[in-house]
């Protein structure tokens, strides 16, 4: 049985994580939850999906995100529009996000991303977010998924995005965390029992015959294969499943095709969500 915990202050209203099911328990029930998967730069497709949702008048009552999904989820939960998020990435160079380091724990540090996010989001804690957010990270020492929903926001988001070997892990309260996708790349389970319906967006397409050309590519490829393997349960638990096609050609750090990736997510969501009002009242899964 996979155990799971949440790190939150004791003397405050908070959500608890049920150890045997990876679900968040709360007296609050939400009509619609949105689960966003990890996938590196492919996460720009999440923003396209959310733009389509906005055009259809579909607003999530709670967001659950892993890795890139946690980053996008934090931005949207903070009240930013998809367009504002795209502008944020356009005006920030890669080396402002991640910097090479000599650390034995990872090739790059995300200290630059931390400062940029603080300024852009305009909030410091989960409680300040207009939309409730759950961020999934991996406790690498105890081999468990951890679902954050209170306390400081940005350290949790960075922990969720810390791809092993590539990025230096994030330490929170003495515990070392890495990318949430390691154990749960499509975080439907944390919000499944507290939402009437859940839309899940999975952006981690895999080419079964992809060639590996260098060390970074090998690490990226290996990680993506692991992500694909752990999404099956959560996919089945969603009510509407959106998986944009043609994502394979975009690498984890591809910031040169932001609009293309965004548009792929937007078009797929427009197609899948056109019958949202009919679909949301039936227990079926829409796949790509």
Please report, for each region that a protein language model flagged, where it lies by residue:
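Patatin-like phospholipase
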Residues: 7-66, 74-288
